[in-house]
Amino acid sequence: MMQLLRRLADQGRTIILVTHATANITLCDRVVFLGQGGRLCYFGSPQDSLKFFGVNTGDFADIYNKLEEEKTVLHEAKRFQNSPDHQRYIANHLSHPTSQQTSNLSPKKVSQNPFKQLTLLTRRYFDLTRRDLVNLALALLTAPIGISLIPLAIRDKNPLILGSEPDPSLAPLALRVLFVFTCAAIWVGLSSSLQEIVKEAAIFLRERLVNLGLIPYLGSKVLILGSLALLQTLLMVGVILIGFKSPEPNLISWQLGVGITTFLTLLTCMSLGLMVSALVKNSQQANSALPLLLLPQIIFSGVLFKMEGIASKVSWLMLSRWSVGAYGSLVNVNAMIPAPTKFPNGTTLPQPFEATPVYDPTWHNLNLNFGLLLLHTSVYLTVTFWLQKRKDIF
């Protein structure tokens, strides 16, 4: 191997070799010995290195033995800096700028074009996504398939429209159906994004060293995941419109309202997934975090349990609360609650579900739900940016 490298060097090529093998090292024109911490202990010809370190055996391995201790490394590095070999092999080969040239020298930072980076990263991320057809199909079809099973479970009931006769079980049933819509969106949103940063951790750090911008990097993630969320929304809304009778619109059309709510829920969940992906250390931790993220969304959504006291405050931190709230406002769940049944003694029959401002069919309430979902998205992406920025090593 060394003979081959010598022939290549004789042909005019520059060969740089990092090795601990000392056999045939005399074939090299120059050798470099580095001590602990990358300190330069010697640079020059192989024969002169033996003289410099006082090795009389002719074995270059003895030089390694001399440089094992840190104190020796510091001493030899300082000695070489003041030696004739340093002057001969290094100082004499360096150009010395004039004082005028020195004053004009200033560090130049390589400029970056964020739009070009965004385009390149988005194209690369898109190519990676479309090549993994199995995961792409699962991401697109999981929620629609799950939602399509609901009509089989509730049989001939129409949970999203008010019937001609009062039904105390209609409002709770409608909420459960809407809750499944939310859970399906949360599940696919998180599972689509939890791996997207942590799996590229090593690549990100390398590219960051060559001027990769954080905003283009995260922007490419948001663009592709947002496009995926749009496709998922179209499929989910299509299944919902086919499988369930549409309620009468109170504010906006059901088709538009359910589409906006589903898309915002998916986008918010994907932003949460990116934040967690930037926080964890490896892909296994990201997978393990999925149940931990999903369970609080279920518990504090306000559907399974009544939110009172501190639980009502915690529910504000859950995107599921705002997603179900938006769905409930569009359906007007409160209007499905029949008038209470009064007994002759003046008491009333307890209702399985009571009207709540969370599902008021007003523009204020609907905009509040949409706005809080967008606020969650902004917070998650901001924290993601901060977490990625902390990983910089320069």
Protein language model annotation of sequence segments:
Residues 1-4, 21-27, 38:
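Helical "lid/switch" subdomain of P-loop NTPase nucleotide-binding domains
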Residues 4, 14, 27-33:
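Conserved catalytic segment of ABC-fold P-loop ATPases
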Residues 9-10, 130, 208:
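Conserved ATPase "switch" residues in P-loop NTPase domains
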Residues 11, 18, 22-25, 216, ...:
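Alpha-helical transmembrane segments and their short interhelical loops
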Residues 25, 130-133, 137, 151-174, ...:
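Membrane-lumen (extracellular) interface motif
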Residues 30-174, 178, 319-394:
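Topological signature of polytopic alpha-helical transporters
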Residues 107-108, 175, 183-188, 254-261:
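Short alpha-helical transmembrane interface motifs in multi-pass membrane proteins
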Residues 150, 167, 171-242:
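Hydrophobic alpha-helical transmembrane segments of multi-pass membrane transport proteins
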